[in-house]
Structure formats: C-alpha cells, structure tokens
C-alpha cells in the first residue's frame, strides 16, 4: 500500500528539491508548510468536473466547458488568476483568449499558473470561460492518475475572489467524438467536433446556458485532495501568443469522397485513402480560401502554406456555412510530387495529425484545442451546398524566448542556417524543451541538452533547462535510472546514456550560471544513477556493459551498443569527472573523492581496453569478449573529450575526423545531425574552425533554405523541425567570434576572432554578466567588447 511522502521530502518538493518517488517508509506528519506556496485564494477553490459520474468517471478523450459570471463595480488595478487543470486548459475572459496551461508535471506536485488578467475585465458583467481536456490515458508528456478537473481562483483584492466551486456552470462537450484516433503513438487524440452541438459562442457573455450543469451537476473536490497532494509554481513564463495568417495557397484539387466519410475515427486515414494528390498548382499569397459548392459524393482540397514551421493553436474563421459542412485538416511539414503531403498514419509513430469540424449554420470562429506544429495544412471540404469562405489562422503559442543573442554575417547561406536554427529552437520550446512539435512534443533529454546550449546563445534563458532537470529527476526506475523523457508512460524509453546526459546538464547549468543548486537539490538522483552504472560493470574489464532491458541510444546510427560499448563508457567517465568538480564546488569532499576514484578506475579501463595498439579509439568490447576493430568518429571525439591516456588525437584527427569533415571518407557509423554537435565542439576547440564551418554550410544548406532544421541530413520521412540539429545556433557564433568560456558563470573568457572565414560579421553573447560583442567590418580587424565583470584571458 502506498504511503505519503515524509515531511522532509514534501517540503523539498515545494521549495525546489527533487520529488522522485511516491513510496515511503514513514507517514507524513502533515503541516501547513507543505502547502505554504499555494495562494490563499486557490486554497478556497474546489476541483470541479461536470457529471455524469464522479470527476474520474468515463473521461477518455474528454472535453469539458466551464462558465462563471460575476459583476464588478470597477475594474481592479490588479486581478491575479491562479489556474490549473488536469490535463490542460484554455482560458477566456469576456470572450478573449488569455492563455493555455498548465506546464506538464506530476499530480503529486501539480503545477499551477499565475496571470494578471485585469486588462481583460470590464465594469459590470464579466465571464470566466475555460475549456479543459483530459486524454484519460498516458502520453509522452502526461501520466494519467484517474482524475480530470479544473481549479481556479481570481483574486481581485478588495473586489473579492471568484473561485471554482459548485456555482460554476459546466458541461461535458458531447459534440466531441470520443473514439478518435491518436495524433501519434506519443500524443493525445484527434479532435472531431460537431459545431452544430458545440456552439463556439459559449465563451462570450450573453450566451444561453440552457443544458449546462450547476450545483449537483458538478463534481467537486478539495484543492489538495489526491492525487493533487502538493502544488508547484509554473517556474517558467507563460507562453507568448500572436496570430499568424496563412501565407499562401500552394495547390488545390477535387476528388471522390469515400462513401462512409461522415463516420470516421481517423481523419488522416480517410484523407489518405481518398487520395492526397492535387491537380492544380496555385502558388499565390492569400489569407483565406473560397470553396465552391461541392457535389454530393465529392470533396475539394486545398494545400495551405504558413511560410515556415509554426506551433500553436489552429483557428478557423468560417463564413457562409449552411450547417453540416465537414472540414478535415491534416498537418504536415512537407509535400512530395503532385503536392501530396507527408501523412504516414499507419507507419512508424503512426502519425495522424488530423482534426475534423462539422460546421454550424452562419458565420463563426472556432479553434481546435491541441498545440500543434506544422508548416503545411491540407484542408478538405465536403458536403457544402453553397460557397464557403475559410480563413485559417495559427495562434502561435510557445515559450517566449527573447532574442538577446545576435548573429549577423555577410555570408547569406550561413545567415539562413543560423536563422533556421534559431527558429527551430523557438518552435521546440514549449512548456519544456521538446524534440519536435510535429509528432511527439516529448522532453527527450539528449535533445534537451543541445537545446539548452542553443538557448544560452539565443536568449541566455536557463529556466526551461532548470524545470526540465527537475522533471526528469522526478521519474526514476527503481534501480536509479531516469527515463529518456518525462513525464511519460513510455517504459520502452529508458535510455541509460540519457541518464548520464542528465548528470551532464547539471554541470551545464552550473557552467552557464555559476549556480550549483540543481546538483545539490538532486544529488540523491545522481547517486542512484551512479549506483546503477557501478552495478553494470564487467568484473574482468571494469567497463560498463550493455543492458538489454533498456534502449541504449548513443547515436541515431550504426554505432556499437551491445557488449561493452565505448561511447557509453566514455559518457560515464565524463559524468564522473563533472560530478567530481561539482562536489568540490559544493563542498561535498567525501563524495568528490569517491567520484574521483570511480573516474580513475573507468579511465584506466578505457585506456587499457578501448585504445588500440596504434593509438586509435575503438568502438568497444564485443559480446564475445573480443575487441572491436572499428574506429568510429564518435569514439575518437570522446577519447579526445576525456583526454584518455594512450589516445593519439593527432593521428585520429588527421586520418579519421578531418577526412570525414572534408567529405573524403565514408564511415560505418556516420554521426547524426544531432551527434555532430560533439564533433563540432571538439574540433573547433582543437583549432579546426574552417573544416567545421564548411561542413555546416554544405550539410545545413537545405535546412537554411527551408527555414528550420531536420531530424537528420536526409529529410525524407523525417521531421523538419528537430532542435537536436539546431546547434548551428551557437556553433556558428563560436566559430566566427572565437569566444570561449573559461570560467563558471562566464566569470572569464578567451577570445580569438576569425579574420579569414568571413569579411563581415557581428556577434553578441548574452552572458549572465553582460553582453560580449565581437564585430568585424569589411577590410578591418575584428573588435571585441567585454564587460568589466568578465575576466578576459587573452
């Protein structure tokens, strides 16, 4: 039987420590300290959910709508809305969209949002409206705990508090089909909504509330009733919002409509079976489309381009509907011959990024619920007996990443690559660093490390990284490993190497900010990870072995993973080295000595077994106990990163790594566009900026032209919005500026600007101690400006 956390763990969770387990030996001695961070107004609110049944009954793929009216004699100067929902909400006040939330998290310490909504209020009658969704199942960003609900409190000071309770009017949105197909293996379900039943005007004042529940028709629960034992502040800013119109109509066409197209659970499958090729190229900029009447048994299709990958909430303004028209939308990032969009609904991740609406009569504006990322949208219309005007809009909804860093260069290709990288980072920064907004929206931690580096240059913001560190720490395997992404149900996505990456991001945070706090807060998680790896050592070699229970990632390529893989052991060594430094910095001297001894042991094993007689790094010990004869680029790079004794970097560099960068040799394990970041960092540090620069200009050129970075170099069937390959966002500035951080928190730097790679550039680093500016004008030597608080070691 599960027991509640001890008071120490509870307080640690409230004040920023780890919350990594839910079974304890000692019951809680409850104290108000546990809920000290919960605003008093929110403590007075109730969790609410419309009946039938209790607030955990029959909620699979469910939407609910809530309305609360109140009057004001005057608009208060400040009106703080505290709000959360399980799983997610959209908030409107007086018909205007306010925000979406909460951030992903765990019910045992559920996040709530805080927003000043005074600008949305008015004298007289006011309306709070919220739409809430719960998938009723797990996804790659949500762990279902058997409950759904809305909790809010609007604190207006002397004007009073409006809170969620049984006075709120609510109803299940029965016009939303419940048995729709998932968007993908990783995400929730398609939204199919019949607007004849679900009037979008419900968010406005004056709407008739006939048929809405109130009082006995709403289930309620105390704010801290299980599973919501504790709460935490969002810890990151609310999303930034703006409306983006469609940019152009790419193509259009028409065809037969499948006979049973009125009753489908997977709109992506329907569209695919009907055919997605379009016959007429259009290529015109426009903000809306006009659909001619469609004959019975026929459909008309339109391929819309938003100009580049966008992320947010799809909105549709409809004019001239007679009621009953069906509009299916399928989202994609690219199209093929005959304007056929990428729609692999039955392969891989089973990506079926589609929605459906059935129109009501008249003119109206409606919006779908799920945040979605895409560039192209196929709009398929059927059953329209009269002309129909459709205006698609995207409400951008993403982390408000500020442009504090600057990269301007005279090379047009380099500039486009950098801007594509920056844009990719922005569409992959939501309530967490996500791999791609397209098919997953999962907080993969190998990706997140690269994204943090990107963000350090683009904005200098570390809050997404800090929140992500805690999120990963909060979901562990009993043996100490963390999950590859979190929160999640994906037990097949436990990646031992990503647990080591998580440790390295503790160091990254320290190196960027000078703060050791995350390491101190999560040291118990670190100890669990190290315990796992020590238990996985081969007694003969002292090297870490492959564990077939888990997915050992290492790289998206043919690198050795079974036996005793070199790359895994190198990552373990690097983690131990960084832990030793952090322990010394935080005065954990006994632990520092322990980690130092463990590092010394694994370093000796690597030198003995993973460096061959010629001084090259090999890929590992094979399952049969023999040494591999393969010398991957990854192994050479990691041996250099770890300064392994006996490794001949000059030989490996000249015969393997540089020939690869120059395109002179092929290799058995080509570094992916993700893992290339480690190649680039290592070779730039070794003085080979030119080779890295030219490699990026060649291999990222297509990405620069497209406007965002791909999952890998071959864009075919791959995501076109993958931030793990957006590292030119910081690598290109490093190459040209020659800025190298040499002290934690940017306390010191060295600068050696390029004088030959480009004639003109301007680069600005937004460090915690002020901006570093490196600028080169045509025909002149570079100039460098460094804040007085940063020690220049030139």
Kindly give the residue locations of the regions a language model identified:
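Active-site core of glycosidic bond-cleaving carbohydrate-active enzymes
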Residues: 444-459, 463-794
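Bacterial N-terminal signal peptides
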Residues: 8-15
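Positively charged n-region of N-terminal signal peptides that target proteins for export
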Residues: 1-4
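Short amphipathic alpha-helical "recognition" segments used for binding
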Residues: 6-7, 439, 444, 600
């Amino acid at each position: 039987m599960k027991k509640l956390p001890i008071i120490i763990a509870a307080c640690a969770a409230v004040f920023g420590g780890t919350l990594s387990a839910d079974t304890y030996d000692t019951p809680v001695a409850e104290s108000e300290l546990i809920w000290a961070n919960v605003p008093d107004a929110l403590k007075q609110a109730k969790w609410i959910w419309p009946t039938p049944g209790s607030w955990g009954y029959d909620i699979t793929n469910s939407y609910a709508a809530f309305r609360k009216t109140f009057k004001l004699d005057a608009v208060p100067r400040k009106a703080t809305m505290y709000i959360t929902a399980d799983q997610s909400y959209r908030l409107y006040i007086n018909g205007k969209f306010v925000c979406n939330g909460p951030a992903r998290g765990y019910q045992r310490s559920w996040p709530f949002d805080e927003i000043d909504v005074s600008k949305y209020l008015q004298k007289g009658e006011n309306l709070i409206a919220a739409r809430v969704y719960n998938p009723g199942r797990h996804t790659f960003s949500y762990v279902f705990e058997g409950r759904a609900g809305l909790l809010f409190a609007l604190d207006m000071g002397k004007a009073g508090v409006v809170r969620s309770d049984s006075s709120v009017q609510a109803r299940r949105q029965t016009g939303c089909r419940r048995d729709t197909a998932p968007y993908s293996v990783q995400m929730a379900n398609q939204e199919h909504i019949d607007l004849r039943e679900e009037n979008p005007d419900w968010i406005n004042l004056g709407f008739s509330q006939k048929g809405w529940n109130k009082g006995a028709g709403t289930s309620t629960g105390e704010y801290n009733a299980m599973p919501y034992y504790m709460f935490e502040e969002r810890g990151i800013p609310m999303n930034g919002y703006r409306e983006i119109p469609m940019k152009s109509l790419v193509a259009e066409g028409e065809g037969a409509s499948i006979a049973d197209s009125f009753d489908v659970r997977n709109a992506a499958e329907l569209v695919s079976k009907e055919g997605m090729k379009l016959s007429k190229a259009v290529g015109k900029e426009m903000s809306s489309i006009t659909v001619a009447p469609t004959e019975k048994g026929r459909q008309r299709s339109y391929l819309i381009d938003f100009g580049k990958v966008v992320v947010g909430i799809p909105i549709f303004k409809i004019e001239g509907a007679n009621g009953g028209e069906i509009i299916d939308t399928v989202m994609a990032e690219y199209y093929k011959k005959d304007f056929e969009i990428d729609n692999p609904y039955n392969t891989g991740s089973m990506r079926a990024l589609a929605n459906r609406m059935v129109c009501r009569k008249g003119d109206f504006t409606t919006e779908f619920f799920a945040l979605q990322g895409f560039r192209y949208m196929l709009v398929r219309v059927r059953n329209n007996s009269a002309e129909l005007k459709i205006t698609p809009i995207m409400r951008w909804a993403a982390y408000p990443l500020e442009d504090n860093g600057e990269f301007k260069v005279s090379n047009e290709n380099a500039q486009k690559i950098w801007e594509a990288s920056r844009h990719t980072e922005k569409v992959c920064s939501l309530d967490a660093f996500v791999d791609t907004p397209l098919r997953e929206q999962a907080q993969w931690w190998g990706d997140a490390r690269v994204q943090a580096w990107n963000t350090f240059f683009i904005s200098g913001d570390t809050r997404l990284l800090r929140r992500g560190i805690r999120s990963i720490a909060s979901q562990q395997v009993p043996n100490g490993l963390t999950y590859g992404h979190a929160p999640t149900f994906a037990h097949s996505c436990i990646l031992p190497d990503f647990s080591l990456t998580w440790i390295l991001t503790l160091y990254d945070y320290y190196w960027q900010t000078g703060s050791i706090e995350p390491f101190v807060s999560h040291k118990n998680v670190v100890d669990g990870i190290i315990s796992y790896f020590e238990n996985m050592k081969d007694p003969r070699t002292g090297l870490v072995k492959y564990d077939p229970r888990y997915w050992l990632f290492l790289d998206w390529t043919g690198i050795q993973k079974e036996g005793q893989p070199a790359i895994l052991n190198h990552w373990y060594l690097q983690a131990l080295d960084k832990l030793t430094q952090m322990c010394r910095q935080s005065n954990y001297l006994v632990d520092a000595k322990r980690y130092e001894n463990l590092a010394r042991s694994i370093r000796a094993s690597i030198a003995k077994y993973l460096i061959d007689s010629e001084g090259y790094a090999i890929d590992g010990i094979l399952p049969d106990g023999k040494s591999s004869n393969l010398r991957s680029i990854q192994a050479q790079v990691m041996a250099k990163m770890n300064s392994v004794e006996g490794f001949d970097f000059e030989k490996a560099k000249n015969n393997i790594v540089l020939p690869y960068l120059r395109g002179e040799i092929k290799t058995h394990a080509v570094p992916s566009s993700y893992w290339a970041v480690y190649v680039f960092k290592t070779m730039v540090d070794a003085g080979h900026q030119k080779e890295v620069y030219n490699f990026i200009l060649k291999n990222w050129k297509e990405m620069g032209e497209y406007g965002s970075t791909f999952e890998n170099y071959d864009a075919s069937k791959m995501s076109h919005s993958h931030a793990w390959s957006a590292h030119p966002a910081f690598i290109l500035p490093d190459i040209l500026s020659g800025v190298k951080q040499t002290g934690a928190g940017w306390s010191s730097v060295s600068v050696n600007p390029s004088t030959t790679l480009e004639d003109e550039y301007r680069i600005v680093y937004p460090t915690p101690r002020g901006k570093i500016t490196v600028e080169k004008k045509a025909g002149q030597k570079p100039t460098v400006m460094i804040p007085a608080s940063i020690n220049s070691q030139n």
